[in-house]
Amino acid sequence: IFVCLGTAIACADADNPVQTTLFQKALTEPGLPIVVSGESVTDLEKQCRVDQERVNWLLDTQNTGYIIPAGQHLAVTRAHQTFRDQHDKKDAEGDFACAWLDHGTAPRDRSYHYAVIPNADAAELGRSAHEWQNSAPYRVVRQDAAAHAVLTVRPAERLTAAFFAPATLDGAGPLPSVTVSKPCLVIVEKRDSGLVLSVTDPDLRLDSNYVSQPGEIVVTLAGNWQISNGTQTGAVRREDDPAATEIALTCRDGMPVRVSLVWNIGGKN
């Protein structure tokens, strides 16, 4: 499952709507269907009507599934389109199936949320959409300009977060609160013996010769943790407050750095 989140969508254009495209698929065969919340659609020049007050789901022509939570302006069409070819800029045309979320004209602080399920099956997708209305396998724990974070509850408890600035993410379920010193990507996964922390710095820090340089990111976890035996990466720093653990990680080349942590029973590093 890929969870897609967007926030702080804004535009001053009052004439043209701002849209988030879910898919735009060429209809290479006549009657190639898409499925819209259980309805198989094959007609051309058709705009599908969807109930915005409920969870909707889509299956595109390549069996990619989409589940869209309620309260969003979803539009789905099958139509003939004309466009400019990207190679020679000549006029071109074709039949396409398209789906998008409409944020309206001149939007301010709009957002979106949907999930993508590759290699999906219509029957299974329909069951999932129905079940997710009451019991989704994940929940969004933060969605704002500072961070996007999702807690996966099935099959494993895992917190996945994209931090756009230094910020603190409150504890989610059995997982501790997380504070980061710089923008980064963080995964915290619960294991029987403790936690696995993964951190990625998307900033390559290229020098004048376009060579990636290392950078340090400090992650603070609530609780008294220590790096488990056999883990070579990371350095634990103890704050004055024993209720928190700082872990300094050196990241480079956009690659993840992974650290295994166990509860520090003795209270010393």
Spans of model-derived segments:
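Terminal accessory/anchoring regions of large secretory-pathway or extracellular enzymes
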Residues: 1-269
